Amino acid sequence: MGGEQEEERFDGMLLAMAQQHEGGVQELVNTFFSFLRRKTDFFIGGEEGMAEKLITQTFNHHNQLAQKARREKRARQETERREKAERAARLAKEAKAETPGPQIKELTDEEAERLQLEIDQKKDAENHEVQLKNGSLDSPGKQDAEEEEDEEDEKDKGKLKPNLGNGADLPNYRWTQTLSELDLAVPFRVSFRLKGKDVVVDIQRRHLRVGLKGQAPVIDGELYNEVKVEESSWLIEDGKVVTVHLEKINKMEWWNRLVTSDPEINTKKINPENSKLSDLDSETRSMVEKMMYDQRQKSMGLPTSDEQKKQEILKKFMDQHPEMDFSKAKFN
């Protein structure tokens, strides 16, 4: 049997022919055997039974290949499903532990008083932190942080620092991302186990809505960028947390927010090492590794890979021309 390239040689012609058969594969096969009967001696040219034997052998060969391809596809899908489920479970567990979730039950006076006290304490802590940053309070050990803040671009000031998953921990939900996908966990504090009929999850190419039926949605906005709806999914973890998995269309981009109404994260502080490089193809992986290297070099004030190449070329040129004086030369 021929190789894959040989097999695909006539695909264009056969596809055009198949498209003209309204009866589908059955009509196409009938046309092919009609051609063999009318234009060749396939059925009568050899020994008795040879034509049938050839047909059976050919069918068995391609049937085995088709069954093998189907098994491999199912195995890949099962592996991907299991990995997504494990990732969603881990994210849900973290969200359940770290995020209080939206309150949908009526608070007692005691709970309301305690909640207000926590809010006031948080505001005091934030004001204290602002004073430290503005220099109105002296704080030992803050010099390095202040220097780092000074070095930050003006346009990046005020942006959130990414969480360990290169996303954001927000009051009502948290999300993480890799270059190719994004995972979201929305915890709900309810007195019953959530079921599919209790929640509303609507994933569109550029819009996402998540919430409980009869309640205002927790998320209802335009996504930062487009996603593959057919490869995205959602499920309920532990009866309390809704997790959503989104497949990005642009797999060479870090999102700075989930939906456009969210606060931005500083993508310059993203750590690509937290992403699964093993999931990327070789070309994309090499590009990401280069990005990681250049990011580390910049953070240490060292030249990037491109700058190093330029320096090496310049050094070779200078070594080859010792008679030239480069002491007053300026290089960009």
UniProtKB/Swiss-Prot annotation:
Please list the residue ranges that the record marks as compositionally biased, kind Basic and acidic residues.
75-97, 121-131
Task: List where in the cell it is found.
Answer: Cytoplasm, Cytoskeleton; Nucleus; Cytoplasm, Cytoskeleton, Spindle; Midbody
Q: What is its main location?
A: cytoplasm
Q: Where is this region: Disordered?
A: 65-108, 121-172
* Positions carrying N6-acetyllysine: 240
Record's note on what induces expression: Up-regulated by prolactin in T-cell lymphoma. Maximum level of expression occurs at the G1/S phase transition of the cell cycle.
Q: Name one GO biological process term.
A: mitotic metaphase chromosome alignment
Q: Which residues carry this modification: Phosphoserine?
A: 136, 139, 261, 275, 278, 286, 299, 327
Modification type Phosphothreonine: residues:
108
The PTM entry states:
Reversibly phosphorylated on serine residues during the M phase of the cell cycle. Phosphorylation on Ser-275 and Ser-327 is necessary for correct formation of mitotic spindles and chromosome separation during mitosis. Phosphorylated by PLK and other kinases.
Spell out the GO cellular component terms annotated for this protein, sorted alphabetically and separated by semicolons. Answer: cytoplasm; cytosol; microtubule; midbody; mitotic spindle; nucleus
Q: How does it assemble?
A: Interacts with PAFAH1B1. Interacts with PLK1 and DCDC1. Part of a complex containing PLK1, NUDC, dynein and dynactin. Interacts with EML4 (via WD repeats).
User: Briefly, what is this protein's role?
Assistant: Plays a role in neurogenesis and neuronal migration. Necessary for correct formation of mitotic spindles and chromosome separation during mitosis. Necessary for cytokinesis and cell proliferation.
Return the protein name. Answer: Nuclear migration protein nudC
Gene coding for it? Nudc
